[in-house]
């Protein structure tokens, strides 16, 4: 692929790791953020120490506070900002962007106020004449591993397979590989909802339960993620792929996962406000729990794990009692997808 200019909106851990992947592939990368000290550190010291204490970035990776500068002549734009500000940033992009570009996002969540997926927000806020069909970049990926060039395989999903293949070629190299998918609903709901299950798996660890219990929550968590996704129009097969079970495994079993760590802290009895303060990073699974619970209630979808986490976080229920309460739920068949 010829050299591309890529604007990455959001110099957090994942945005920074993806900037390095693109730089390794010979592309021109511009990171945009709104914290002057961070932008200055990236440009002068070539580090992003809030997220990676011992990583030195290539000097070719540039950062800016100026959105217009970041977007100038960009062939592709990658949103990697927290879910709650995606719409705001998309509005800003729409005001500044003066040419058509491939628009991607690599965030995982659902908008709290509208319950919308992030690709829908980008479609609504960025005029069609200024963008491709949205491409979702999602899958099992810890930034801490990608930044040291550990092997990572994820998904590029779009309603337009040509756009998905462009992103596949843009990112793929000897340690980072993308597979294409056209099931945007499935890929986005998998990426968002697995954070809830990761909180639950972490909570079990914090409560002192063993691998049997964690495996149960992850597996039955996948079942309820699939249940809701299919209700929203997704292909159930998507949840057996990288963006589904793959992401659930990596997020639901690892100390790298901020959602798992938050759940573990909740299981130990720590207060949510203290957990969020100590972590210093967005815990998407907390807000997504509320959104998913509300959608499930509205659509009549059975999501017992999500309900248990919701009641613990938002209604003050004891997390151990909430989880153990699921053991007395009605008996059900395991496989819901027989034809």
Curated annotation (Swiss-Prot):
Q: Where is the signal peptide?
A: none
For this entry, the protein name equals Glycerol-3-phosphate dehydrogenase [NAD(P)+]
User: What are the UniProt keywords, alphabetically?
Assistant: Cytoplasm, Lipid biosynthesis, Lipid metabolism, NAD, NADP, Nucleotide-binding, Oxidoreductase, Phospholipid biosynthesis, Phospholipid metabolism
Q: In which pathway does it act?
A: Membrane lipid metabolism; glycerophospholipid metabolism
Q: What's the family?
A: Belongs to the NAD-dependent glycerol-3-phosphate dehydrogenase family.
Native source organism of the sequence? Streptococcus equi subsp. zooepidemicus (strain H70)
InterPro entries assigned: 6-PGluconate_DH-like_C_sf, 6PGD_dom2, G3P_DH_NAD-dep, G3P_DH_NAD-dep_C, G3P_DH_NAD-dep_N, NAD(P)-bd_dom_sf
Record-linked PROSITE patterns: NAD_G3PDH
């Amino acid at each position: 692929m010829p050299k591309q200019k890529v604007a990455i909106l959001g110099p957090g851990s994942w945005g920074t790791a993806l900037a390095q992947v693109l730089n390794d592939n010979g592309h021109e990368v511009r990171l945009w953020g709104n914290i002057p000290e961070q932008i200055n550190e990236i440009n002068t010291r070539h580090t992003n120490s809030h997220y990676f204490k011992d990583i030195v970035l290539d000097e070719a990776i540039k950062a800016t506070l100026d959105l217009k500068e970041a977007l100038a002549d960009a062939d592709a734009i990658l949103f990697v900002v927290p879910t709650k500000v995606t719409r705001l940033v998309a509005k800003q992009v729409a005001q500044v962007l003066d040419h058509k570009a491939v628009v991607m996002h690599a965030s995982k969540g659902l908008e709290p106020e509208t319950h919308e997926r992030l690709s829908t927000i980008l479609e609504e806020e960025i005029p069609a004449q200024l963008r491709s069909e949205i491409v979702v970049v999602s899958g099992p990926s810890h930034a801490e591993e990608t930044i040291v060039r550990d092997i990572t395989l994820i998904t590029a999903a779009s309603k337009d397979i040509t756009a998905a293949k462009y992103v596949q070629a843009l990112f793929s190299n000897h340690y980072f590989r993308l597979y294409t998918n056209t099931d945007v609903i499935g890929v986005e709901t998998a990426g968002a909802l697995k954070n809830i299950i990761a909180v639950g798996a972490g909570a079990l660890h914090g409560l002192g339960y063993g691998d049997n219990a964690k495996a149960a929550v992850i597996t039955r968590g996948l079942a309820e993620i699939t249940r809701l996704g299919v209700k929203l129009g997704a292909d159930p097969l998507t949840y057996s792929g990288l963006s589904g079970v793959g992401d659930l495994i990596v997020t639901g079993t690892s100390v790298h996962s901020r959602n798992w760590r938050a759940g573990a802290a909740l299981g130990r009895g720590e207060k949510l406000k203290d957990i969020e303060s100590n972590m210093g990073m967005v815990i998407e699974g907390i807000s997504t729990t509320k959104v998913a619970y509300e959608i499930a209630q509205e659509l009549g979808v059975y999501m017992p794990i999500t309900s248990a986490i919701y009641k613990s976080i938002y209604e003050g229920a004891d997390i151990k009692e909430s989880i153990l309460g699921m053991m007395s739920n009605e008996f059900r068949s395991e496989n819901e997808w027989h034809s």
